[in-house]
Amino acid sequence: GYYPFVFEDPHSYYEKVSRVIDKTVFEDIATYYNLKTPNLQYFKRLLTYLASIPPGDLNFHNLAKSLGVDHKTVEHYVSILASVGLVREMRPYEGGGPGLRKPSKILLNNTNLIHTLQQYLGHQPSKGMERELFFVQSLQNAGIEIFYSKQADYRTRKVIFEIGGKNKTRE
């Protein structure tokens, strides 16, 4: 597991991860960013939403509309979630030209968060979602700068990566 308490009691692991999420949102974010309790629910809803969609399918305008806030607020809240380590913000590879200038790709910070939030939703995470997040998490944790790309799923400054699955081809 991503968190050290996985060895303490594997049966209560996801419950403990859920408590980490709640503590981070309702105590750490509330205190550090001086946010009121009603606003904190948006953070939990954002995380749950991110766990339910394929990586890269986040549309700030649509999400803002469904939450009843403006898109700048959603963008700000996502940046807060990134600063506290609950999500990862991916930037486009600028070498691809103007066609890549779209909002950041937002991923949960690690696969344990996906499993915990999916369990909360009563779902199983998709293998593709897990595979992509594990890849990104591994490279970023190793200090490698990685971007999302129009050519393939991801790239570094020199190498292009397509995260395969059973329906992927070599083209």
Segment roles from a protein language model:
Residues 79, 85-171:
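A cross-kingdom feature that marks ATP-driven nucleic-acid transaction machinery
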